């Protein structure tokens, strides 16, 4: 089994390129904090190179930037090539199958939560036409503010009014 799950921050903006056949490929590096601290009490980070293909690559390039918090699910792969000096160069990287955006874009709440770039268990050949997993119905967009939530979705909108609940319904 070859499975990698990472959560970290991008060290620089993703690099989006296209193959000669027009297939999009994005590369980026995630800084992932280690689970333990060093002798000085600081948590060190590992810098993991990641690659993602096709429409997901374009989405990553459009919506993530340096410092963005992202979750990556994929597999580890090693490839090699001959460098300019004639020596064999080995590269180990994560081939991302899905990337989740774990914070709002620009910190201003323009986007909601996380966007799953690919349905769970789907392969590259089975990409969703709607990579954000959102309904394309735009009927409620007029009621949305910057947070992306409709005004009726606020569970605390009745703050300050008494709540009618029986003592028998309370768990304590």
Curated annotation (Swiss-Prot):
InterPro entries: NA-bd_OB-fold, Primosome_PriB/ssb, ssDNA-bd. Residues 103-172 are annotated as: Disordered. It comes from the Bacteria. GO terms for biological process: DNA recombination; DNA repair; DNA replication. GO terms for cellular component: nucleoid. A motif (Important for interaction with partner proteins) lies at residues 167-172. Homotetramer. Plays an important role in DNA replication, recombination and repair. Binds to ssDNA and to an array of partner proteins to recruit them to their sites of action during DNA metabolism. NCBIfam families: PRK06751.1, ssb. This is Single-stranded DNA-binding protein. It comes from Bacillus anthracis.
């Amino acid at each position: 089994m070859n499975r990698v799950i990472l959560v970290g921050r991008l060290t620089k903006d993703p690099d989006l390129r296209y193959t000669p056949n027009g297939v999009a490929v994005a590369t980026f590096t995630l800084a992932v904090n280690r689970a333990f601290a060093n002798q000085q009490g600081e948590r060190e980070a590992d810098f993991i190179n990641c690659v993602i293909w096709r429409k997901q690559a374009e989405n990553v390039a459009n919506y993530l930037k340096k410092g963005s918090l992202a979750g990556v699910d994929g597999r580890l792969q090693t490839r090699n090539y001959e460098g300019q000096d004639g020596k064999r160069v080995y590269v180990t990287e994560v081939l991302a199958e899905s990337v989740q955006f774990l914070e709002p874009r620009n910190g201003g709440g323009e986007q909601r939560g996380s966007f799953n770039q690919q349905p769970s268990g789907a392969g590259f050949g089975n990409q969703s036409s709607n990579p954000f997993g959102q309904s394309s119905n735009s009927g409620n967009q007029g009621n949305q503010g910057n947070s992306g939530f409709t005004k009726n979705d606020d569970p605390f909108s009745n703050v300050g009014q008494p709540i009618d609940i029986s003592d028998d319904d309370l768990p304590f």
